[in-house]
Amino acid sequence: MKEKVVSLAQDLIRRPSISPNDEGCQQIIAEGLEKLGFQIEWMPFNDTLNLWAKHGTSEPVIAFVGHTDVVPTGDENQWSSPPFSAEIIDGILYGRGAADMKGSLAAMIVAAEEYVKANPNHKGTIALLITSDEEAAAKDGTIRVVETLMTRDEKITYCMVGEPSSAKNLGDVVKNGRRGSITGNLYIQGIQGHVAYPHLAENPIHKAAPFLQELTTYQWDKGNEFFPPTSLQIANIHAGTGSNNVIPAELYIQFNLRYCTEVTDEIIKQKVAEMLAKHNLKYRIEWNLSGKPFLTKPGKLLDSITSAIEEITGITPKAETGGGTSDGRFIALMGAEVVEFGPLNSSIHKVNECVSVEDLGKCGEIYHKMLVNLLDS
């Protein structure tokens, strides 16, 4: 299995699919799946290409979810080998997308293909949802496919997202949930004027200072057994014209919260509004909800992937919910159990992104064993 996984991973990496471009990656995947009897459905939205492939017609529906798009390479001269050459050096496969996530995508595909070859009349349904819009806006990718499936009353029972979850060793971490993410774009109004005549102006920076102190020190919750406490970080602040003698007319503050299941986005919005009113600030605010928190509690999916990892690697994974958002948040809207597992994440989005060839082979074996655990038991 390892050779097939690595070969497919190299084919995908060699295509410079900077988000939201697919550069033919999904066509390669679809051709292989179609030969095995998978039903292929293309779902393009604007400049994003999405693939929904299925084998089988009954429940449970097990979906592998991944993306073919990658982030930009940065200065290619800093790479030890060209970022889209997919070179293997001392057992390590280098290239943009090697770890995030063309390597695990290849492993999921090969695992599904090998299972179907051996079990053409398997029970349940094996599906793959692949998008080219995960790394950027994520507006025309998985979420649009999910919306389409929900309008057709299609279901996903179990979902494996191939994001690179491992920390120090393959299989040491699986993600069984993610925190929600909400961003506030806050504009606080003042009155512009000359710094020498402050009584004729109103400095929004000075007015906002007590509010910012409260906003950044407020304890939203203490977390729970599955999630760390909700956290807030200010990402951007801007005011003024660049001149040292002009009191600014407006202060812009952008902040983001990664929140757990102890609060909701509505609670967050309400509390921020209360703080702003308390400090008598004139403002307007625009909210952007990237995703709500989701959690897959211990059950058949988590048991199946844990058992598979233990058998292949000898490691018992730790289930965690930290880190950023993923497309798993969209699948969770369908009521599915969602787990993320993939190779080491230490090199993702970096120069010389890479993945161990041995780890890729084991990823394929783990995904395959997970299918066996879910469908053959």
Swiss-Prot record:
<dbReference type="InterPro" id="IPR036264">
    <property type="entry name" value="Bact_exopeptidase_dim_dom"/>
</dbReference>
<dbReference type="GO" id="GO:0009089">
    <property type="term" value="P:lysine biosynthetic process via diaminopimelate"/>
</dbReference>
<feature type="binding site">
    <location>
        <position position="100"/>
    </location>
    <ligand>
        <name>Zn(2+) 2</name>
    </ligand>
</feature>
<keyword id="KW-0378">Hydrolase</keyword>
<feature type="binding site">
    <location>
        <position position="349"/>
    </location>
    <ligand>
        <name>Zn(2+) 2</name>
    </ligand>
</feature>
<protein>
    <recommendedName>
        <fullName>Succinyl-diaminopimelate desuccinylase</fullName>
        <ecNumber>3.5.1.18</ecNumber>
    </recommendedName>
</protein>
<comment type="subunit">
    <text>Homodimer.</text>
</comment>
<dbReference type="InterPro" id="IPR005941">
    <property type="entry name" value="DapE_proteobac"/>
</dbReference>
<dbReference type="InterPro" id="IPR050072">
    <property type="entry name" value="Peptidase_M20A"/>
</dbReference>
<feature type="active site" description="Proton acceptor">
    <location>
        <position position="134"/>
    </location>
</feature>
<keyword id="KW-0457">Lysine biosynthesis</keyword>
<dbReference type="GO" id="GO:0008777">
    <property type="term" value="F:acetylornithine deacetylase activity"/>
</dbReference>
<keyword id="KW-0028">Amino-acid biosynthesis</keyword>
<feature type="binding site">
    <location>
        <position position="163"/>
    </location>
    <ligand>
        <name>Zn(2+) 1</name>
    </ligand>
</feature>
<dbReference type="Pfam" id="PF01546">
    <property type="entry name" value="Peptidase_M20"/>
</dbReference>
<dbReference type="GO" id="GO:0006526">
    <property type="term" value="P:L-arginine biosynthetic process"/>
</dbReference>
<dbReference type="InterPro" id="IPR011650">
    <property type="entry name" value="Peptidase_M20_dimer"/>
</dbReference>
<dbReference type="GO" id="GO:0050897">
    <property type="term" value="F:cobalt ion binding"/>
</dbReference>
<keyword id="KW-0170">Cobalt</keyword>
<feature type="binding site">
    <location>
        <position position="67"/>
    </location>
    <ligand>
        <name>Zn(2+) 1</name>
    </ligand>
</feature>
<feature type="binding site">
    <location>
        <position position="100"/>
    </location>
    <ligand>
        <name>Zn(2+) 1</name>
    </ligand>
</feature>
<dbReference type="InterPro" id="IPR001261">
    <property type="entry name" value="ArgE/DapE_CS"/>
</dbReference>
<feature type="active site">
    <location>
        <position position="69"/>
    </location>
</feature>
<dbReference type="GO" id="GO:0008270">
    <property type="term" value="F:zinc ion binding"/>
</dbReference>
<dbReference type="GO" id="GO:0009014">
    <property type="term" value="F:succinyl-diaminopimelate desuccinylase activity"/>
</dbReference>
<comment type="function">
    <text>Catalyzes the hydrolysis of N-succinyl-L,L-diaminopimelic acid (SDAP), forming succinate and LL-2,6-diaminopimelate (DAP), an intermediate involved in the bacterial biosynthesis of lysine and meso-diaminopimelic acid, an essential component of bacterial cell walls.</text>
</comment>
<keyword id="KW-0479">Metal-binding</keyword>
<comment type="similarity">
    <text>Belongs to the peptidase M20A family. DapE subfamily.</text>
</comment>
<dbReference type="InterPro" id="IPR002933">
    <property type="entry name" value="Peptidase_M20"/>
</dbReference>
<comment type="pathway">
    <text>Amino-acid biosynthesis; L-lysine biosynthesis via DAP pathway; LL-2,6-diaminopimelate from (S)-tetrahydrodipicolinate (succinylase route): step 3/3.</text>
</comment>
<feature type="binding site">
    <location>
        <position position="135"/>
    </location>
    <ligand>
        <name>Zn(2+) 2</name>
    </ligand>
</feature>
<keyword id="KW-0220">Diaminopimelate biosynthesis</keyword>
<dbReference type="Pfam" id="PF07687">
    <property type="entry name" value="M20_dimer"/>
</dbReference>
<dbReference type="GO" id="GO:0019877">
    <property type="term" value="P:diaminopimelate biosynthetic process"/>
</dbReference>
<keyword id="KW-0862">Zinc</keyword>
